[in-house]
Design a protein with these regions (language model features):
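Short gly/ser-rich loop at a beta-strand->alpha-helix junction or flexible surface loop bordering the NTP-binding
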Residues: 1-135, 154, 159, 268-293
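Surface segments flanking catalytic/ligand-binding clefts of nucleic-acid enzymes
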Residues: 113, 118-293
Length: 293
């Protein structure tokens, strides 16, 4: 199954065990997000719990759980797969308060990628139910910053770092930036298919966020996955694209920005690649005729 899948199962089993022994409490934070099917930035090794009503934390410490104080209203609680948990917006807000910006952003973008109806306006409207706690303003700003195109936590990290570098002036020469853009290519057997790229800068510089999962065997035969990615990259390069791949270490450091700056400086300007399709990823997924074509 692979280490990644095993760790995910361990996460869910930990959450299940804690919930079984704490029947009056409600999951919140990253544990609730994972139970609701969202990606998290870090592995869940301790379960955040809250009590319905207006509760305070107490002194006893537990290795597998932590109790959070504050107001938890009935409308912020749901039951999912037999376990009581905070609704997603509250779980993500608590993740923001207790674990920081990056953890919350990964969860937000995971939710938005999986559920197209979760637009920025919809999520901001949902924050009206949240307690007037410290961090609410920053959380609302984070929602406005979030996107709906990140299919993985690594894509969220890369997207966020690039956008912040552009905004701060650390990364220059970016005239256009787009996410999840499709190109017509041929697969290894010669059949037409669509290659979706994670980030497209200036129309022709492609950034692919490659986590260990693609080549670990968790998504199928590892050697086959590597060969498939190499063929895909060659097809894109044949259209005039410049492809740069980044992993977790680069995406979380300035190495990503340095890599992109070198590439942009060496290849300035905007170009249009000939095999780009006009449909967005969301349009493609929801339109069977486009996929069939």
């Amino acid at each position: 199954v692979g280490d990644i899948q095993q760790r995910r199962q361990q996460e869910l089993e930990l959450i299940r065990q804690v919930a079984r022994h704490c029947k009056t409490a409600v999951l919140t934070g990253p544990a609730a997000a994972r139970w609701l099917g969202l990606s998290t930035f870090d592995w869940v090794t301790r379960v955040d719990l809250a009590l319905p009503g207006n509760s305070r934390t107490w002194g006893k410490q537990y290795p597998d759980r932590i109790y959070r104080g504050g107001m938890l209203r009935p409308g912020e609680i749901c039951t999912h797969k037999g376990v009581r948990t905070a609704v997603a917006i509250r779980a993500i807000f608590d993740s923001y308060r207790y674990y920081g910006r990056t953890e919350a952003l990964v969860q937000l973008e995971s939710a938005r990628f999986q559920h197209p109806h979760l637009t920025v306006d919809t999520l901001l409207h949902k924050t009206a139910t949240l307690p007037r706690a410290k961090g609410l303003r920053g959380f609302r700003e984070l929602i406005a910053h979030s996107g709906d195109t990140s299919a993985s936590a690594l894509e969220t990290i890369a997207r966020d770092r690039i956008l912040r570098a552009i905004a701060s002036g650390q990364l220059t020469g970016v005239e256009t930036i787009e996410f999840q853009i499709g190109f017509e290519v041929l697969d290894a057997d010669g059949w037409p298919t669509i290659a979706w790229v994670d980030v497209l800068i200036n129309g022709f510089i492609i950034v692919e966020a490659d986590g260990a999962e693609k080549t670990s065997g968790a998504m199928g035969d590892a050697e086959e996955a590597v060969n498939r990615e190499r063929h895909r990259e060659k097809e894109l390069q044949n259209t005039g694209a410049i492809v740069r791949r980044v992993g977790w270490k680069q995406a979380q450091s300035d190495a990503l920005i340095a890599l992109l700056q070198l590439c942009i400086d060496a290849h300035p300007g905007v170009r249009q690649l000939p095999t780009r399709i006009d449909a967005t990823y969301r349009e493609w997924c929801t339109n069977p005729e486009r996929r069939a074509g």
